[in-house]
Amino acid sequence: MLKFSFLFLTVEKPGGLFDFDGTLPLIAIQFLILMFLLNILLYTPLLKIIDERSEYIANNLQEASIILNKANELSSQYEKEFSKIKKEVELDSLTLQNLHKNILEIEIISSQKIFENYLNQTINNFDSEKEKILTSLDEEINSLSSEIITKIVA
C-alpha cells in the first residue's frame, strides 16, 4: 500500500506545475469578485471610519491648540496682573511700615514728653518739699538754738 501512495504522488498531470487550463480564468474572476466585495463591504466602511477618526483627531488637536494658546495668553495675563498686584502689595506694605514707624515715633515722642513732664513735676514737687523741709528744719534749728541759748544763759 505504501508503494501505491508513492506512485500516486509521483504522477503528474500534463502541463507541469503551472497548468493554464479553464481553472485559471475562473480563479482570477473569483479573486476579482472577492476583491470587489471586500472593497465594498469591508475596506470602504473601514476607510470611511478611519477618515472620520482622523478628521475627529485633527479637529480635537486644533481645538486643543486653540485652548492651549488661550491658556498661555491667560497665564501670561495673570502673571502680569500678579506681578502688578505684588508690586502694589509691596508698595502698600512699605507705606504701612512707614506709617507704623511714624506712629510709633509719635507715640515715643509723646511718651517721652509725658515722662519728662512727670519727671519735671516730680522734681519740682521734690524741690518744693525740700524747701518746706529746709524751712521747717531752719525753724526747728532756730527754736532749738534759742532753747540752748536760754539754757546756757540761765
Curated annotation (Swiss-Prot):
Coiled coil: none annotated. Its main location: plastid. Keywords: ATP synthesis, CF(0), Chloroplast, Hydrogen ion transport, Ion transport, Membrane, Plastid, Thylakoid, Transmembrane, Transmembrane helix, Transport. The keyword Calcium does not apply. GO terms for molecular function: proton-transporting ATP synthase activity, rotational mechanism; proton-transporting ATPase activity, rotational mechanism. Signal peptide: none annotated. The chain crosses the membrane at residues 22-42. It comes from the Eukaryota. GO terms for cellular component: chloroplast thylakoid membrane; proton-transporting ATP synthase complex. It is found in: Plastid, Chloroplast thylakoid membrane. Belongs to the ATPase B chain family. In plastids the F-type ATPase is also known as CF(1)CF(0). HAMAP family: ATP_synth_b_bprime, ATP_synth_bprime. F(1)F(0) ATP synthase produces ATP from ADP in the presence of a proton or sodium gradient. F-type ATPases consist of two structural domains, F(1) containing the extramembraneous catalytic core and F(0) containing the membrane proton channel, linked together by a central stalk and a peripheral stalk. During catalysis, ATP synthesis in the catalytic domain of F(1) is coupled via a rotary mechanism of the central stalk subunits to proton translocation. Component of the F(0) channel, it forms part of the peripheral stalk, linking F(1) to F(0). The b'-subunit is a diverged and duplicated form of b found in plants and photosynthetic bacteria. This is ATP synthase subunit b', chloroplastic. It comes from Vaucheria litorea.
